[in-house]
Amino acid sequence: LPESAGEYAARIDSADTRIRRFLVKEDIITIPDYVKDLDTNVPWIVRPGGPNFWEQVQFRNPTPDHLHAVIPGHRFDGLLERHNTHPIRGKITSAARTEGWGVYLEEAFMNVGLLDDVPRVRELIHIFGIFRAARVPADVWLQLNEMTVDEVVAWWMERTPWLDENVARVDAEIYLRRPPGYGLGYTIGMLQMQQ
């Protein structure tokens, strides 16, 4: 794990540069000139109890979350959406489409060579996948009132490396506030992208 905000910022810059270069070199996605620095999804925070789940992954290597949430993920996707004047394509309103795209990117970039020389990053993406897989049945159980938030939190924490109670609780509560199927949408959306 990085020992300072500066070291972490350097890791983010390195991941961003690596991803952008790969996108251009492999002619995967055109990056419009108006797309500049898109920042990061996980800021540097020193917590008394140590890093939370997302920080455990991100601080080790920002690449997985950068793909999902920054470029070519959510921030990039959202910026392109705001610049798209098409009445249909200019409006992305499906959570399954949005989250599915992010998950698809993680999987796709493992398969097209971006991570060939950094196999430990694949492990980080697989840890994300473990948490997402655990979230699928729990999303259903919460909506059916078959499990409480506390039960889901405990169930997830038993199955997911590094998962802390705070992140698990926030995710469980998000699923109760969103339309049913939000947790499923990550996986279903990715499968739809693959089709």
Residue ranges of model-derived segments:
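N-terminal maturation segment of proteins
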Residues: 1-195
